[in-house]
Protein backbone atom coordinates (compact mmCIF):
# COMPACT_ATOMS: atom_id res chain seq x y z
CA UNK A 1 0.00 0.00 0.00
CA UNK A 2 1.28 3.45 -0.88
CA UNK A 3 1.81 5.93 1.97
CA UNK A 4 0.76 9.48 1.19
CA UNK A 5 1.19 10.88 4.70
CA UNK A 6 4.58 12.41 3.99
CA UNK A 7 3.44 14.03 0.77
CA UNK A 8 -0.26 14.93 0.83
CA UNK A 9 -0.19 16.00 -2.81
CA UNK A 10 1.21 12.69 -3.99
CA UNK A 11 -2.18 11.00 -4.21
CA UNK A 12 -3.59 13.79 -6.34
CA UNK A 13 -0.49 13.65 -8.49
CA UNK A 14 -0.78 9.90 -9.02
CA UNK A 15 -4.44 9.98 -10.04
CA UNK A 16 -4.41 13.25 -11.97
CA UNK A 17 -5.33 12.66 -15.62
CA UNK A 18 -3.85 14.82 -18.38
CA UNK A 19 -6.28 17.35 -19.80
CA UNK A 20 -7.19 18.16 -23.37
CA UNK A 21 -5.64 21.47 -24.40
CA UNK A 22 -5.29 23.65 -27.46
CA UNK A 23 -2.14 23.04 -29.44
CA UNK A 24 0.44 25.67 -30.16
CA UNK A 25 1.08 26.60 -33.77
CA UNK A 26 4.19 24.43 -34.12
CA UNK A 27 2.43 21.40 -32.59
CA UNK A 28 -0.31 21.17 -35.22
CA UNK A 29 0.45 18.26 -37.57
CA UNK A 30 -2.15 16.39 -39.62
CA UNK A 31 -0.08 13.20 -39.67
CA UNK A 32 -0.29 12.95 -35.87
CA UNK A 33 -4.04 12.28 -35.95
CA UNK A 34 -4.44 8.81 -37.55
CA UNK A 35 -7.67 7.96 -35.70
CA UNK A 36 -9.36 11.12 -36.95
CA UNK A 37 -8.18 10.33 -40.48
CA UNK A 38 -9.49 6.79 -40.32
CA UNK A 39 -12.85 7.85 -38.88
CA UNK A 40 -13.25 10.47 -41.62
CA UNK A 41 -12.34 7.92 -44.29
CA UNK A 42 -14.91 5.47 -42.89
CA UNK A 43 -17.59 8.15 -42.99
CA UNK A 44 -16.76 9.17 -46.57
CA UNK A 45 -16.76 5.55 -47.73
CA UNK A 46 -20.03 4.74 -45.98
CA UNK A 47 -21.89 7.70 -47.41
CA UNK A 48 -20.43 7.19 -50.88
CA UNK A 49 -21.89 3.69 -50.80
CA UNK A 50 -25.18 5.03 -49.44
CA UNK A 51 -25.48 7.65 -52.18
CA UNK A 52 -24.64 5.12 -54.91
CA UNK A 53 -26.87 2.31 -53.59
CA UNK A 54 -30.28 3.45 -55.01
CA UNK A 55 -29.09 3.83 -58.60
CA UNK A 56 -26.89 0.73 -58.34
CA UNK A 57 -29.87 -1.31 -57.15
CA UNK A 58 -32.03 0.06 -59.96
CA UNK A 59 -29.35 -0.71 -62.55
CA UNK A 60 -28.90 -4.20 -61.14
CA UNK A 61 -32.62 -4.87 -61.35
CA UNK A 62 -32.90 -3.57 -64.92
CA UNK A 63 -29.65 -4.95 -66.34
CA UNK A 64 -28.78 -7.85 -64.06
CA UNK A 65 -30.03 -10.45 -66.55
CA UNK A 66 -28.18 -8.89 -69.50
CA UNK A 67 -25.25 -11.02 -70.74
CA UNK A 68 -22.90 -8.04 -70.36
CA UNK A 69 -24.44 -6.72 -67.16
CA UNK A 70 -24.56 -2.91 -67.10
CA UNK A 71 -21.60 -2.53 -69.47
CA UNK A 72 -23.79 -1.13 -72.33
CA UNK A 73 -24.60 1.89 -70.14
CA UNK A 74 -20.98 3.03 -70.31
CA UNK A 75 -20.46 2.70 -74.05
CA UNK A 76 -19.71 5.74 -76.17
CA UNK A 77 -22.77 7.59 -77.42
CA UNK A 78 -24.83 6.72 -74.34
CA UNK A 79 -27.73 5.32 -76.36
CA UNK A 80 -28.46 2.49 -73.94
CA UNK A 81 -28.18 4.87 -70.99
CA UNK A 82 -30.57 7.42 -72.50
CA UNK A 83 -33.04 4.72 -73.51
CA UNK A 84 -32.95 3.26 -70.00
CA UNK A 85 -33.46 6.64 -68.32
CA UNK A 86 -36.32 7.43 -70.71
CA UNK A 87 -38.31 4.33 -69.85
CA UNK A 88 -41.74 5.13 -68.34
CA UNK A 89 -42.44 4.21 -64.75
CA UNK A 90 -41.92 5.45 -61.19
CA UNK A 91 -38.39 4.03 -60.79
CA UNK A 92 -36.45 7.12 -61.90
CA UNK A 93 -38.28 9.63 -59.64
CA UNK A 94 -37.94 7.27 -56.67
CA UNK A 95 -34.21 6.82 -57.27
CA UNK A 96 -33.63 10.56 -57.73
CA UNK A 97 -35.53 11.49 -54.56
CA UNK A 98 -33.89 8.80 -52.42
CA UNK A 99 -30.41 9.63 -53.72
CA UNK A 100 -30.96 13.34 -53.10
CA UNK A 101 -32.20 12.65 -49.56
CA UNK A 102 -29.11 10.60 -48.76
CA UNK A 103 -26.93 13.30 -50.30
CA UNK A 104 -28.51 16.00 -48.11
CA UNK A 105 -27.94 13.89 -44.99
CA UNK A 106 -24.33 13.35 -46.10
CA UNK A 107 -23.78 17.10 -46.52
CA UNK A 108 -25.22 17.90 -43.09
CA UNK A 109 -23.32 15.18 -41.26
CA UNK A 110 -20.25 16.18 -43.23
CA UNK A 111 -20.16 19.43 -41.26
CA UNK A 112 -20.06 17.39 -38.05
CA UNK A 113 -17.23 15.25 -39.42
CA UNK A 114 -15.40 18.40 -40.52
CA UNK A 115 -15.71 19.86 -37.03
CA UNK A 116 -14.54 16.64 -35.38
CA UNK A 117 -11.50 16.46 -37.67
CA UNK A 118 -10.55 20.08 -37.01
CA UNK A 119 -11.06 19.59 -33.28
CA UNK A 120 -8.70 16.60 -33.38
CA UNK A 121 -6.14 18.65 -35.30
CA UNK A 122 -6.34 21.63 -32.94
CA UNK A 123 -6.28 19.86 -29.56
CA UNK A 124 -4.04 17.38 -27.78
CA UNK A 125 -3.79 15.55 -24.48
CA UNK A 126 -1.07 16.42 -22.00
CA UNK A 127 2.37 17.78 -22.63
CA UNK A 128 2.99 15.32 -25.47
CA UNK A 129 -0.12 16.53 -27.33
CA UNK A 130 -1.35 13.02 -28.05
CA UNK A 131 -4.50 12.55 -30.09
CA UNK A 132 -7.70 13.19 -28.09
CA UNK A 133 -10.45 10.62 -27.85
CA UNK A 134 -12.75 10.43 -30.83
CA UNK A 135 -15.75 11.19 -28.59
CA UNK A 136 -14.10 14.42 -27.43
CA UNK A 137 -13.52 15.56 -31.02
CA UNK A 138 -17.06 14.64 -32.06
CA UNK A 139 -18.43 16.60 -29.09
CA UNK A 140 -16.56 19.71 -30.23
CA UNK A 141 -17.73 19.17 -33.80
CA UNK A 142 -21.31 18.85 -32.59
CA UNK A 143 -21.13 22.12 -30.67
CA UNK A 144 -19.75 23.88 -33.74
CA UNK A 145 -22.21 22.23 -36.14
CA UNK A 146 -24.66 25.12 -36.45
CA UNK A 147 -22.05 27.81 -36.96
CA UNK A 148 -20.01 25.72 -39.42
CA UNK A 149 -23.13 24.80 -41.41
CA UNK A 150 -24.12 28.46 -41.69
CA UNK A 151 -20.61 29.47 -42.76
CA UNK A 152 -20.52 26.69 -45.36
CA UNK A 153 -23.93 27.68 -46.71
CA UNK A 154 -22.97 31.34 -47.04
CA UNK A 155 -19.59 30.58 -48.62
CA UNK A 156 -21.12 28.05 -51.02
CA UNK A 157 -23.87 30.47 -52.03
CA UNK A 158 -21.34 33.22 -52.73
CA UNK A 159 -19.15 30.84 -54.73
CA UNK A 160 -22.07 29.63 -56.85
CA UNK A 161 -23.22 33.21 -57.31
CA UNK A 162 -19.83 34.32 -58.62
CA UNK A 163 -19.52 31.36 -61.00
CA UNK A 164 -23.11 31.65 -62.23
CA UNK A 165 -22.70 35.40 -62.81
CA UNK A 166 -19.53 34.83 -64.82
CA UNK A 167 -21.14 32.13 -66.95
CA UNK A 168 -24.25 34.25 -67.51
CA UNK A 169 -22.22 37.34 -68.41
CA UNK A 170 -20.04 35.32 -70.75
CA UNK A 171 -23.03 33.82 -72.55
CA UNK A 172 -24.92 37.12 -72.66
CA UNK A 173 -21.98 39.01 -74.20
CA UNK A 174 -20.97 36.24 -76.61
CA UNK A 175 -22.51 37.74 -79.74
CA UNK A 176 -21.22 41.25 -78.92
CA UNK A 177 -17.71 39.92 -78.32
CA UNK A 178 -17.79 37.93 -81.56
CA UNK A 179 -18.81 41.00 -83.55
CA UNK A 180 -16.23 43.37 -82.02
CA UNK A 181 -13.26 41.10 -81.26
CA UNK A 182 -13.65 38.17 -83.57
CA UNK A 183 -14.54 34.61 -82.63
CA UNK A 184 -11.05 33.58 -81.48
CA UNK A 185 -10.43 36.65 -79.29
CA UNK A 186 -13.97 36.45 -77.91
CA UNK A 187 -13.29 32.89 -76.80
CA UNK A 188 -10.16 33.95 -74.92
CA UNK A 189 -12.03 36.80 -73.22
CA UNK A 190 -14.78 34.43 -72.12
CA UNK A 191 -12.23 31.89 -70.91
CA UNK A 192 -10.39 34.57 -68.93
CA UNK A 193 -13.65 35.68 -67.33
CA UNK A 194 -14.45 32.12 -66.26
CA UNK A 195 -10.94 31.57 -64.89
CA UNK A 196 -11.05 34.81 -62.90
CA UNK A 197 -14.43 33.86 -61.47
CA UNK A 198 -13.11 30.41 -60.57
CA UNK A 199 -10.13 31.98 -58.78
CA UNK A 200 -12.47 34.30 -56.88
CA UNK A 201 -14.66 31.37 -55.87
CA UNK A 202 -11.58 29.50 -54.70
CA UNK A 203 -10.48 32.49 -52.60
CA UNK A 204 -13.95 32.60 -51.04
CA UNK A 205 -13.63 28.92 -50.22
CA UNK A 206 -10.27 29.54 -48.56
CA UNK A 207 -11.75 32.32 -46.44
CA UNK A 208 -14.71 30.10 -45.55
CA UNK A 209 -12.36 27.34 -44.39
CA UNK A 210 -10.40 29.82 -42.28
CA UNK A 211 -13.61 30.98 -40.62
CA UNK A 212 -14.76 27.42 -39.93
CA UNK A 213 -11.48 26.19 -38.45
CA UNK A 214 -11.37 29.31 -36.27
CA UNK A 215 -14.92 28.55 -35.10
CA UNK A 216 -14.11 24.95 -34.20
CA UNK A 217 -10.91 25.98 -32.45
CA UNK A 218 -12.84 28.57 -30.45
CA UNK A 219 -15.45 25.98 -29.48
CA UNK A 220 -12.72 23.56 -28.39
CA UNK A 221 -11.12 26.29 -26.30
CA UNK A 222 -14.42 27.34 -24.71
CA UNK A 223 -15.71 23.83 -24.05
CA UNK A 224 -16.58 24.65 -20.45
CA UNK A 225 -18.28 27.98 -21.08
CA UNK A 226 -21.54 28.90 -22.75
CA UNK A 227 -21.25 31.66 -25.32
CA UNK A 228 -23.45 32.95 -28.10
CA UNK A 229 -22.83 31.81 -31.64
CA UNK A 230 -22.70 35.43 -32.82
CA UNK A 231 -19.77 36.33 -30.56
CA UNK A 232 -17.83 33.25 -31.62
CA UNK A 233 -18.59 33.99 -35.26
CA UNK A 234 -17.33 37.57 -34.90
CA UNK A 235 -14.07 36.32 -33.42
CA UNK A 236 -13.69 33.72 -36.15
CA UNK A 237 -14.31 36.32 -38.86
CA UNK A 238 -11.74 38.64 -37.29
CA UNK A 239 -9.12 35.87 -37.15
CA UNK A 240 -9.85 34.82 -40.74
CA UNK A 241 -9.64 38.42 -42.01
CA UNK A 242 -6.38 38.91 -40.14
CA UNK A 243 -4.90 35.70 -41.59
CA UNK A 244 -5.91 36.47 -45.16
CA UNK A 245 -4.72 40.09 -44.84
CA UNK A 246 -1.33 39.28 -43.31
CA UNK A 247 -0.57 36.09 -45.26
CA UNK A 248 -2.66 36.13 -48.48
CA UNK A 249 -0.13 34.32 -50.67
CA UNK A 250 0.58 31.73 -47.98
CA UNK A 251 -3.11 30.95 -47.46
CA UNK A 252 -4.06 30.88 -51.14
CA UNK A 253 -0.89 29.03 -52.14
CA UNK A 254 -1.27 26.40 -49.42
CA UNK A 255 -4.81 25.70 -50.55
CA UNK A 256 -4.09 26.08 -54.26
CA UNK A 257 -1.40 23.43 -54.75
CA UNK A 258 -3.33 20.93 -52.65
CA UNK A 259 -6.53 21.60 -54.60
CA UNK A 260 -4.67 21.25 -57.91
CA UNK A 261 -3.08 17.96 -56.87
CA UNK A 262 -6.42 16.67 -55.57
CA UNK A 263 -8.08 17.53 -58.90
CA UNK A 264 -5.26 15.81 -60.77
CA UNK A 265 -5.79 12.65 -58.71
CA UNK A 266 -9.49 12.67 -59.60
CA UNK A 267 -8.58 12.95 -63.28
CA UNK A 268 -6.16 10.03 -62.99
CA UNK A 269 -8.83 7.95 -61.28
CA UNK A 270 -11.41 8.81 -63.94
CA UNK A 271 -8.97 7.89 -66.71
CA UNK A 272 -8.18 4.56 -65.05
CA UNK A 273 -11.89 3.83 -64.66
CA UNK A 274 -12.52 4.66 -68.32
CA UNK A 275 -9.73 2.37 -69.48
CA UNK A 276 -10.94 -0.60 -67.42
CA UNK A 277 -14.70 0.01 -67.23
CA UNK A 278 -15.50 -2.87 -69.54
CA UNK A 279 -13.05 -5.28 -67.96
CA UNK A 280 -13.47 -7.48 -64.93
CA UNK A 281 -11.39 -9.63 -62.67
CA UNK A 282 -8.01 -8.30 -61.61
CA UNK A 283 -8.37 -5.07 -63.61
CA UNK A 284 -11.58 -4.16 -61.81
CA UNK A 285 -10.04 -5.03 -58.45
CA UNK A 286 -7.06 -2.81 -59.22
CA UNK A 287 -9.40 0.08 -60.04
CA UNK A 288 -11.21 -0.37 -56.72
CA UNK A 289 -7.90 -0.30 -54.83
CA UNK A 290 -6.73 2.71 -56.84
CA UNK A 291 -10.00 4.48 -56.09
CA UNK A 292 -9.54 3.96 -52.35
CA UNK A 293 -5.90 5.06 -52.55
CA UNK A 294 -6.91 8.24 -54.37
CA UNK A 295 -9.64 8.89 -51.81
CA UNK A 296 -7.13 8.45 -49.00
CA UNK A 297 -4.62 10.75 -50.70
CA UNK A 298 -7.26 13.45 -51.21
CA UNK A 299 -8.27 13.15 -47.57
CA UNK A 300 -4.62 13.55 -46.56
CA UNK A 301 -4.37 16.69 -48.68
CA UNK A 302 -7.56 18.05 -47.14
CA UNK A 303 -6.37 17.35 -43.58
CA UNK A 304 -3.01 18.91 -44.41
CA UNK A 305 -4.73 22.07 -45.64
CA UNK A 306 -6.92 22.26 -42.52
CA UNK A 307 -3.82 21.94 -40.34
CA UNK A 308 -2.22 24.80 -42.27
CA UNK A 309 -5.41 26.86 -41.93
CA UNK A 310 -5.39 26.23 -38.18
CA UNK A 311 -1.85 27.54 -37.97
CA UNK A 312 -2.90 30.69 -39.83
CA UNK A 313 -5.74 31.47 -37.40
CA UNK A 314 -3.87 30.47 -34.24
CA UNK A 315 -2.82 33.66 -32.40
What does each model-found stretch correspond to?
Residues 2-315:
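Hydrophobic alpha-helical membrane segments
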Amino acid sequence: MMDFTENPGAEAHVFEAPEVRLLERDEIRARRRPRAWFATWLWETAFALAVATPIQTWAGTAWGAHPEGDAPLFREGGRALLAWLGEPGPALPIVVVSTFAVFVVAVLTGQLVFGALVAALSTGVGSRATEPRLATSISAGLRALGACSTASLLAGTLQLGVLASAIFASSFAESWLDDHLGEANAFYVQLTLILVATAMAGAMGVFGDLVKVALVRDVAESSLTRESVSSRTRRALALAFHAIRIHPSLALGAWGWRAALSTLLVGIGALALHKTSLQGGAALGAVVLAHQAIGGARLALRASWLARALKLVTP
